[in-house]
Regions:
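Signature for HUH/AEP ssDNA processing cores
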Residues: 1-95, 102-106, 168, 172-174, ...
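Conserved short hydrophobic interaction patches
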Residues: 81-82, 189, 207-210
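Basic, alpha-helical nucleic-acid-binding regions used in initiation and control of genome expression
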Residues: 201-225
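Amphipathic alpha-helical interaction segments
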Residues: 83-84, 108-109, 212, 219
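DNA replication initiation modules
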Residues: 55-72, 76, 101-202, 216
Length: 225
């Protein structure tokens, strides 16, 4: 995995983005060009001449973004540990990140804000013709802070990042009934994502326990759950 590419060496991503657009508005976060249903409108170099510009995702790609600095840091730690093959762009003003994934199987059906992910993080999920800001009023959100190497391929959205409908809030969960909640959450993953016991066990041990819970459980206690 590559990290920290020089901004002068990054010229967009032809796999992830199908076109680039001029941005504008009070905060520079909105497209000022029509693009819904249209193909290639501008190249990266053409759009980069403007104080604000952005991009539109290619078909079969999703943007999973975290509007919380702590969750963004946690995601990056997980991504590095799990060696996920994705691209991550960061808003340097607040530490929030956008992560980009293949979803050719269309496992994610709804694009909306504040979706609970299987691993316990909370995210906004974008797709389709959504405009994604890359520069806002002169402030760049590139180059990537995390990306694949030239000889690697981007991966499909991992199970950990698929949205689920649940009232369980695993983020920073501490002692006090959490074992019961973690047991009940297994049923959510089984019924909604059709994950088997081994896949759920791996998710708990590799991601949820060390990164999501406030204080990780001992292995013996986790095995009981």
């Amino acid at each position: 995995m590559e990290q920290g590419v020089n901004s002068n060496e990054w010229h967009g991503n032809a796999k992830i983005f199908r076109t680039y657009l001029k941005g504008g508005g009070k905060d520079g976060k909105r497209s000022v060009e029509k693009h819904k249903g249209l193909g290639n409108i501008r190249t990266f170099g053409d759009a980069a001449q403007f104080p604000s510009f952005g991009a539109v995702l290619s078909d079969g790609w999703v943007d999973i973004s975290f509007d919380d600095a702590e969750m963004s840091k946690t995601f990056l730690a997980i991504a590095k540990d799990q060696q996920w093959h994705c691209m991550v762009l960061e808003n340097k003003n607040n530490g929030h990140i956008h992560t980009y994934w293949k979803d050719t199987e269309h496992k994610i059906q709804k694009f909306r804000r504040d979706q609970r992910l299987a691993c316990g993080l909370l995210a906004d999920i974008h797709g389709g013709d959504t405009y994604i800001p890359l520069r806002c009023l002169g402030s760049d959100r590139f180059p990537p802070v995390f990306d694949i190497s030239p000889d690697e391929e981007y991966q499909e959205v991992p199970d950990e990042l698929l949205p689920v409908q649940t009232n369980y809030n695993l983020w920073q969960m501490d002692a006090g009934g959490r074992n019961n909640d973690l047991y009940g959450y297994i049923l959510v993953l089984q019924s909604q994502l059709q994950l088997d016991d081994d896949r759920i066990r791996t998710m708990y041990k590799a991601v949820i326990n060390p990164y999501i819970l406030k204080d990780p459980l001992e292995d013996a206690e986790l095995d009981i759950i």
